[in-house]
Amino acid sequence: MKKLKINYLFIGILTLLLAAALWPSIPWFGKTENHIAAIQARGVLRVSTIDSPLTYSVINGKKYGLDYELAQQFANYLGVKLKVTVRQNISQLFDDLDNGNADLLAAGLVYDSARVKNYQPGPMYYSVSQQLVYRVGQYRPRSLATVNENQLTIAPGHVVVNDLQRLKETKFPDLSWKVDDKKGSTTLLEEVISGKLDYTIADSVAISLFQRVHPELAVALDVTDEQPVTWFSRLDDDNTLSAALLDFFNSINEDGSLARIEEKYLGHGDDFDYVDTRSFLRAVDNVLPELEPLFKKYAKEIDWRLLAAISYQESHWDPLATSSTGVRGLMMLTKNTAQSLGLTDRTDAEQSISGGARYLEDMMAKVPETVPEDERIWFALAAYNMGYAHMLDARSLTVKTKGNPDSWTDVKQRLPLLSQKPYYSKLTYGYARGHEAYAYVENIRKYQISLVGYLQEKEKQEAEAMKLAQDYPAVSPEELNKTPFPLLSFLSQSSGYLTHSPSLLFTPQKKEEK
């Protein structure tokens, strides 16, 4: 998979052009009636988005998402509350702008020449490419020349339709596709996984995140080059909202908060390993249930799923794991560390998890207070892996090379240098396997993303199954076996977890309400 590129030079040029266009209207309150005045009078910033791990999602009652966090900061910047409306597809998002039901669209939408004819783009803050995906084990197209409408389905309003039309006119005259007006990109990705669809197209970041939970999804080819991502608002003579957005993005770029949010959601890397991810998810099904109560019990200061991800990276959840250097157990503790924590048996699952959690808490407590709260864990994990002293060296090296020692984005880039003599020879604590610490933290982040998404998916499907049980009467085994897709066959699909709504497979008459 192509690596994600945040092309700040390109984004900067586009932002400058936007600034030039907006310059006459920078004084926000120069008019008696403008968008900013209306938003502040209302006291609410209305943002429409799409439910996805990157843009906006709700997990255990808490809201997450790159676009959500940026929108919340922008609302704070304006001194108003944030109201988020979730839509099913991109067409519905732009309907909200057209109908006056939204002030902004914040949903990972790409800048496109056709869109900017009718809508006002904001500053560009990262970039993606559009990719055609298929299911592992099925035919992989090597070119769009062989793709037709019986195979390729696109979500309504998807910007790639314009690119496909240009490609059809210039390179692939037989290229064809269909648009499903009722489904969003996430649903179409799920249908590719289930085998209901052959292909669809989505952006590279969304695909990368989706693969952490659904490793059967594979990239066949890139349909476009990198495209900048932006927010959209209404296009009219009043540019006060666009001017405010430009000022806001400039401020969070200067104070580093934009980089921190991007690191949180985009900084885990996108080197996808199908075999490793599939093995991990199998372990989640087969091994984690026995250990889950212990992770929940001892993960006091951190998310238990992160503690579980650390343990998987350390030992693949094998309580008897032993390395060539003598570290042992689920959390791979050294003998000295175990003794300092009062542990008597490193191969005892409960002792190992409790000891590892306490040791990580010690590392967290040592991280300088100048490090932002949401990045402290990554510094602590690097220290957990290579020692706290070497983490201090990494911060020192970051300063010497004109980086920010409190930014995980900057520090992690220097970690591999700790094993190179021109650098470690000038550091206080000398040589360290910094490249291993870098990979260690990145792998844990990937496992955590997979685990959170996978468990959320299972909870969603369990809720659907419960609703199904309430809506339909019991189905006898004889009736069930008459269906083309028996329940047991359905439940065995996709590595033991559901990939689409159970309601698709049932046709019995719904119970009448009494």
From Swiss-Prot:
Pfam families with a match to the protein in the record: SBP_bac_3 (PF00497), SLT (PF01464)
EC number: 4.2.2.n1
InterPro entries hit by this protein: Lysozyme-like_dom_sf, MltF, Solute-binding_3/MltF_N, Transglyc_AS, Transglycosylase_SLT_dom_1
Active site feature: E314
GO BP terms in the entry: cell wall macromolecule catabolic process; cell wall organization; peptidoglycan catabolic process
Bilayer topology: Peripheral membrane protein
Keywords associated with the record: Cell outer membrane, Cell wall biogenesis/degradation, Lyase, Membrane, Signal
Signal peptide range: 1-30
Record's subcellular location: Cell outer membrane
MF (Gene Ontology): peptidoglycan lytic transglycosylase activity
Region named Non-LT domain: 31-269
Catalysed conversion reaction: Exolytic cleavage of the (1->4)-beta-glycosidic linkage between N-acetylmuramic acid (MurNAc) and N-acetylglucosamine (GlcNAc) residues in peptidoglycan, from either the reducing or the non-reducing ends of the peptidoglycan chains, with concomitant formation of a 1,6-anhydrobond in the MurNAc residue
PANTHER family in UniProt: MEMBRANE-BOUND LYTIC MUREIN TRANSGLYCOSYLASE F (PTHR35936:SF32)
Function: Murein-degrading enzyme that degrades murein glycan strands and insoluble, high-molecular weight murein sacculi, with the concomitant formation of a 1,6-anhydromuramoyl product. Lytic transglycosylases (LTs) play an integral role in the metabolism of the peptidoglycan (PG) sacculus. Their lytic action creates space within the PG sacculus to allow for its expansion as well as for the insertion of various structures such as secretion systems and flagella.
Entry domain remark: The N-terminal domain does not have lytic activity and probably modulates enzymatic activity. The C-terminal domain is the catalytic active domain.
Protein name in UniProt: Membrane-bound lytic murein transglycosylase F
Organism: Salmonella choleraesuis (strain SC-B67)
Underlying gene: mltF
